[in-house]
Each structure stands twice: as C-alpha cells, then as structure tokens.
Amino acid sequence: MKKIILLSGIILCSVVATAGEVLLRFGAISDNHLDRTRPATFQRTKQAFELFKKHNVDFFVDCGDVADTYQPDMFQLWRRLYSEVFSDAGTRPDFLMIPAGHDRIGTTWEQGYGDFVKLTGSGTVNPVKCIRGFHFVSIAQKEKPDILKQNLANAATGSPAGTPIFVITHYPPMNTTPGTSSASGGDKNYRAILNNYPQAVVISGHTHTRLMDERAIWQGEFTAVNAGTLAYTDNAGIANATERCYSYDASIWEVYKNKIVIRRFNVADGREMYPDSPWEIPLPFQKKNAPYNRENRMKNFPVPEFNQETAVTFHPVRHSWDRWGTLNFPSPENSRSLNRYRLVLEKCNSDGQYGHHGIIEFVRNKAAGKMECLSFSAGYLEPANYRFTLTPVNYFGRSGTPAHGKFKVRKVPWKEIKNDYVPVVFSGRKEGQKLTPDSEGFFSAASDFRLVLPHEIIERSIQDKKKLIISIGIECIGAGNPARLRIVNGSGRIVTLDSICFRESAQRQQYTAVFRPSDKQNYSLLIRNGDPGKYRFSNIRFYLY
C-alpha cells in the first residue's frame, strides 16, 4: 500500500509492504549517443525500450548524452521510439531523463538543454519525481550543485528513515565507480553533498563503464552505480589491442522492503548477465556491512586462476597490418571475476640471457569463452626471442596463478617517414592554449591535453594511401598513467583504429597507434582523463604501412 502526503511543497512518500513484494521495478540506461549518421544507435535505444516493456517496468531513467552532438532530430527520435514501443498511452511507463554535455555540442548550453527538454518531453532540466513511494531527484551536467543539495534535502524530509533516495546524474560522484578519479570523469561537488546521505543510491553515466565490470557498483558513504552505455565502451586505465567496442547495456532494478536487486542485461539479445547472481543492496544501508565497499570486495571477490596444465601457444600473423601474432590459451577458472591479463615480457640478448623488458595489460572486452586470444602490435618490440609470464587479475587488483611461455618476434615491414618531431602540445580536447615545456622537456598538464600530429605526415599517408603508425614514449612525473590515449580529429572525434601501451616502468610507457587519416584536417594524440602532473614525450616516430 502506498501513502503520499503533500506538505509545503515537499512530497512525503511511504510504502507499507511485505519483504517479498516488489514495490517498484524500473529500468536504467545512459549514453545513447544517438547520431543520424549511425542508425545502429537507434536500434540499441529501441531494444532497451523493448527490454523494459518485456519486463513490465513501472518507470525508467536515462542519464544523459542521449544524442552524440546537438541534433534536435535525435531528441525527437528518442521520443518517437519511446511512443512506438510503448504504444498504449494508458500503460506507458513514466520516465526521468536529463541532458548532458554531448546533447549541446555545436550550440550553447541553453539552446541544447532547452530543445532537449521540449523535444524529448522530459519536462524540465532537473526533474524530481516520486514513483510508487520512492523519491527520484536529478541534476544535469553543468547545473549548480545547490540544486542537488536542495532536492536531496527535500527528498530526505519526505522519506521514511532508511528508505532509498535515487539520484540521477550524468557525471558520477568523484572517486566512486571506474573513471571518476579526475575532474573530467567525476564530480567532487556531488561527492561532498552525497556523503551526507547514506540512503542515496546514485545512478550515473558518462564514463562508458561496462555493466559487466564488477566495479560499476560502489559503496562508501552511500551507493553509486554506473548505468553503462548504449553506444561504445572505452577501456579506461588499461592498454588494450582493441580500442573500443559497441555496448548494449541496460539494467532493471527491483526494489523490495529490505533490498534492491539490480539485474544487468544485453539489449541486443535480451539476455541477463549472470542471472544466478544479480547485485543485491541490503536495506537500510549500513556502511560497515555494505557488500560492495572496497574492503569487502577485496576480501570476498574470487580470483581467476590458471590451472597447472594451462598451455599458452603463440601463433604468428603474417599478413596483418597491425598485429604480429596472437597468444591463445584456455580461460582461467573463476573467469567471471577476470578484469585483465598482465603480460610480463623478458627479452633474450645476444648472450642468450633473458632480462626484464616491460609489461602489457589487456582488458577483457567480453565474457570469457572456453578459449582466449590476445593479439597486439609490434611497434615497440624488436625482432628477438621473448619469454613471458601471463597472469589473470580480478577487478580489484588481486592476481591469480600465472602461465608461462616463449615466442619470437619477426621484423615488421614498416617504412619510417619521420623521427625528428619536436612535440607541440595544447590543453583541451579540441580547443585550448599551447603549453610550453620546462627546461627538461616536461609539460605541466591536467585532465585532457593533446599532442598535435605533423600535418605533412597526414598528407603523406593520404597521398600514399597507407595506414599511419605512430609510436610515442610518454613519461609521467607526479601523476598516474594517462587514463586513455586516443587519436582525435580536428573536431575532437576519436578516429583511432588500434592502439596499445607498453609499460616499461612505473613512470614510462610506449604508446603505439594505427589509423588511416580520412582527410587533410588536424589530428592529435589525446591524453584523456589523466591526473594532474608533468608529462614528457620521447622517441616519437611515424611509419607508413
């Protein structure tokens, strides 16, 4: 039974129910990135709505970046897909959605947000709703934090003690889910406000974190969950052969009197991820016993293990423009807990002795099958014999039993076209000021900054109809490794085909990227979501293949 009382503009909601009764079932999506040039984005949003309809949700939320850029027709498309899938207006679920930065790229914040609200039918920029006895408050990107502060205070006044308050944001609170350690990934003002509301359950987007990532749920002073993305996912923080892959994430939330159950889905086929073990949040919230706080996860989350008989085989790739070979091996036990593989390389010298050469880490892009295959470029590996230790690592940094092997690297037929480039660095993703290095060649930078690629090599690549290969050493002082490295064009759009980072030490890594310029515009290497610090570039080389 639901009770709703209105007092002085504050909605007082309460629910009387048994422990086994679902009080509210709602869906969550984010980062649709609808784009008129990419019809596949339409399909993924439609599939999410169809999933919500199949599971008979009462309500759903969309956490922003609905369009890839300011495209009013994409706001209209969102509304049309919603109306088509939920064709019966009498049973159509309500929704709460907020605009975000991509929704206004190409116009002003005011124009972008105004058209978003008008054409999607969201009602307002920062909607507040009470659905079946539960408060939902929201704040759109770039809106004043005081809006969140006031709406949370009102919701807390209108909710019984211990009842969850759902908070919808685009940027996650800082230092919660993956990708939120810097100002370009997480919001410190949200975090400061939410620390005072242990009953808050935050649902956010922005970082394109996969829902299969077990770190997408976090508990500390409150609970935070990343809603994933319906567009693409970047491999934040770890080098990988595959830059990005398409994403089909949606979740369905079931709220009970004593818990919240979060079920994760792939909208492409409607299948639930890990149906035997959905995320469960006990109610009311208790920080010490919260199952998804880092201390409990480090202690209880399983570690992937290779068995003693695991054999890793090397297969050369003789006719590939970007890869010199693959490593093939059986998936480890407890593969669901697997986040990445760490490959430690040793190189054989002329005396036949092996010495430490460096480390490569590979993110797992999808649920592991019976066999795994890792493939990568050779721009930083000289022709030689190598041996390796391959270790599975879980989402919280714990390593399992490693496997070992050897391989030989052949010479890659690349043609070097430039090796005397002096770094030209600007702040920002596509705009910003030119940065000046200090006497030792270090650039002081925070968050996003970019290394401009020489225009003559772009022209040469287009003229010769060759792919362009870039190899760059990056040294960091006073900062963690850059979270993401991407090649972007003059408009700031990511164009990299393939890349990998080779970590030679805690401070230095070699980055190799392969891409094909499409026109004679400006291109840059974007260092994205990095921590503030000093960066120096060295061993910069360009090749054609």
Tell where the protein language model's regions lie, with residue ranges.
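A short C-terminal boundary segment appended to hydrolase-like catalytic domains
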Residues: 244, 251-362, 366-372, 393-421
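Beta-strand-rich modules
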Residues: 379-398
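Hydrophobic h-region of N-terminal signal peptides that target proteins for export
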Residues: 10-18
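Extended active-site neighborhood of metal-dependent phosphoesterases/phosphodiesterases
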Residues: 71-161, 188-195, 212-256, 260
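Active-site-proximal segments of metal-dependent phosphoesterases and phosphodiesterases across multiple
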Residues: 22, 158-204, 211-217
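N-terminal active-site segment of His-dependent metallophosphoesterases
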Residues: 17-75
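Extracellular and organelle-lumenal recognition/adhesion modules and their flexible linkers in secreted
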Residues: 412-545
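Active-site neighborhood of phospho(di)ester-bond hydrolases with catalytic His/Asp-centered motifs
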Residues: 28-30, 59-65, 93-101, 139-140, ...
